[in-house]
Amino acid sequence: MEKISIAKELSSKSYPGRGIIIGRSADGTKAVTAFFIMGRSANSRNRIFVEDGEGIRTQAFDESKLEDPSLIIYAPVRVLGNKTIVTNGDQTDTIYECMDRQMTFEQALRTREFEPDAPNYTPRISAIMHIENGEYNYAMSILKSNNGNPDSCNRYTFAYNNCPAGEGHFISTYLHDGDPLPSFEGEPKLLDIPDDMDAFADLLWESLNEQNKVSLFVRYIDIATGKYESKIINKNV
């Protein structure tokens, strides 16, 4: 698979929606994730990321302007022991609760489907990072309608074992802007993952469409120790 330039991938599209990146730093020592949200409506743009325990949650920036919280207020990132869960919706909680009961990532997501926001039927994208005894594996998932038909849910899981240093994968909810919005297609895209968290966060943030970007979260986890550092960038400050 040919590597993409993530800067070019993001800057060439006004609205990829929500996006997840998972990978490994160039020096091989860090497990890396990034998650961004974008918005076209006032309700969707009225959000920030805030820390919540070891994870994050979305929160209304101006509570007085919050209209419908159902699909926009959730915890995108939660940590369950040596696993980090990243998603674009409340399926984070489904994965957390099911895996806490010894179910798998895939089993948890079989209980969920795409969002009910007709006619877009926004895909649910999810990822799980597993770090144990110096080993690091991850998986990514997308649940989407059958080419816009809500009668069928298509479920895809991509598992990556022993990820090479400096490589990662990117998945987003939409291919690009549109009406209705076209769901992401194909495998998660291969990209380079650098060592510098701040520089990577800045690159991603600067590449996202200025009008539509809302918030970005980046975390680098030390594979040997489990210690992590994170960065949150919110457009609303």
Write out the residue ranges for each language-model feature:
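Conserved short alpha-helical segments that host acidic/polar catalytic motifs at enzyme active sites
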Residues: 1-237
